[in-house]
Design a protein with these regions (language model features):
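Alpha-helical transmembrane segments
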Residues: 1-25, 29-30, 54-82, 162-289, ...
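Membrane-interfacial loop-to-helix junctions in multi-pass transporters
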Residues: 132-143, 186, 244
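Membrane interface segments of multi-pass transport proteins and intramembrane proteases
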Residues: 30-31, 92, 122-132, 292, ...
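Transmembrane alpha-helix boundary signature
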Residues: 59-72, 90-96, 113-127
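A generic, lipid-embedded transmembrane alpha helix
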Residues: 46-62, 110-115
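Membrane-embedded alpha-helical core segments of multi-pass
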Residues: 82-87, 104, 108-119, 140-150, ...
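Juxtamembrane helix-capping/reentrant segments at transmembrane boundaries
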Residues: 34-47
């Protein structure tokens, strides 16, 4: 208990006191994520919050972990955190092409699967499949990790959204690890909670700083590790969820996962690249209905809480029934949102005129040329 509490407190304190310093440095050096026609923010805001999240998380884990019982796989976890963070930070500052980001994510995933042994080895009866061969396990694990990394990256388009969803997901995973005395992963999960709680103080609308790709991809990576360890832990399965752990983990991450799967499916159906930017994400749909940043974040946070609660409520049902309920409720709500919820107010995009007397030109600093950005990152 002391170890877990220390993890939360240290991560919170380090992140909380680093953020004002990062905001000041960003302001002094004009390191901003500039608004454009697709982004939902209207003011210059730094996207370097991932630096504080990464520092608070990693230092917390290193300081409170018992190195006498330190899992060998954790050296690869720390290396993976560092690589995904640096990759995201480079993208936040200089912008990376999509293929370079995907290549980096594949490198991280290969390290976790081949070296750390982070594998889904059993589907617990999903589609009639139980044990997976090594090759099948590699494919399923790669898909899961890459999907979760990008799902958090792609929902990070509204102040407080990715942080609040990541917080509740890690809190749920951490609680069950703690209840089953899996302290290593409980510490990891609760350290994320501590860092995100501090970050949300500065990220809730109106945001003073964004987590950027360096933060959102790191949170996605953390959730992928926790989800796979949750699915693979025999104590959690036998004590709480029978054969339903994949559906439970899915329910804890349902909003980001189904959002990215739905949007990718829509793009493929329209014969577009899955990575082509659009405004079909849930936060875009809600904003198009006239909701503010805060209202969008609170709505989706409560939706994730509802799905987690529903999943736990029906945890003793068959795996397929739980998944069917999750999909049915989610897509029913999306349909109702699109077809029956009225628009509260019209959105008007003000575009600059060509005349010199028009709206004053927005400065574009060399380090952040928003118009030239080509990446998977969507707002």
């Amino acid at each position: 208990m002391i170890q877990v509490a220390a993890g939360i407190i240290i991560a919170f304190v380090i992140t909380y006191f680093l953020l004002p310093l990062i905001i000041k440095i960003a302001d002094d050096n004009q390191l901003y994520d500039l608004p454009d026609e697709r982004k939902l923010h209207k003011h210059e805001v730094s996207s370097l919050g991932g630096i504080a999240i990464f520092t608070g998380l990693v230092l917390s884990v290193l300081l409170v972990s018992d190195f006498n019982n330190f899992n060998a796989e954790f050296q690869y976890f720390i290396a993976a955190f560092f690589i995904i963070f640096i990759l995201g930070l480079i993208d936040d500052i200089f912008f990376l092409k999509a293929w370079k980001k995907v290549l980096g994510q594949l490198l991280v995933t290969a390290m976790l699967t081949f070296k750390a042994g982070l594998l889904i080895t059993d589907l617990h009866g999903f589609a009639g499949i139980h044990s997976l061969s090594y090759t099948e396990s590699i494919y399923v694990s790669f898909f899961t990790i890459i999907l979760l990394i990008n799902s958090f990256n792609l929902i990070d388009g509204v102040d407080g959204l990715a942080g609040s969803i990541g917080f509740i997901s890690c809190l749920l995973f951490g609680t069950f690890f703690f209840m089953n005395h899996v302290l290593t992963y409980a510490v990891l999960a609760f350290a994320v909670c501590g860092a995100l709680l501090a970050f949300l103080k500065y990220n809730f609308p109106p945001a003073k700083i964004f987590m950027g790709d360096s933060g959102s991809t790191l949170i996605g990576l953390m959730c992928s590790i926790l989800a796979i360890k949750f699915i693979e832990n025999p104590a959690i399965q036998s004590n709480f969820f029978n054969e339903a752990t994949p559906a439970i983990a899915f329910g804890f991450l349902l909003v980001p996962l189904l959002d990215v799967l739905r949007v990718f499916a829509l793009r493929i159906y329209k014969k577009q690249s899955p990575l082509a930017p659009d405004r079909n994400h849930l936060h875009h749909l809600l904003q198009n209905k006239g909701l503010s940043h805060l209202e969008v974040t609170v709505t989706l946070f409560l939706a994730q809480l509802m799905f987690a609660g529903l999943t736990l409520l029906v945890r003793n049902l068959d795996l397929h029934i739980i998944l069917a309920l999750q999909f049915t409720v989610y897509f029913s709500l999306v349909y109702i949102l699109k077809e029956f919820i009225p628009v509260r107010k019209k959105l008007h995009i003000v575009r600059a005129e060509t005349s010199e007397s028009a709206i004053p030109e927005l400065k574009v600093y060399p380090i952040f040329r928003a118009k030239e950005k080509a990446s998977v990152r969507e707002d």
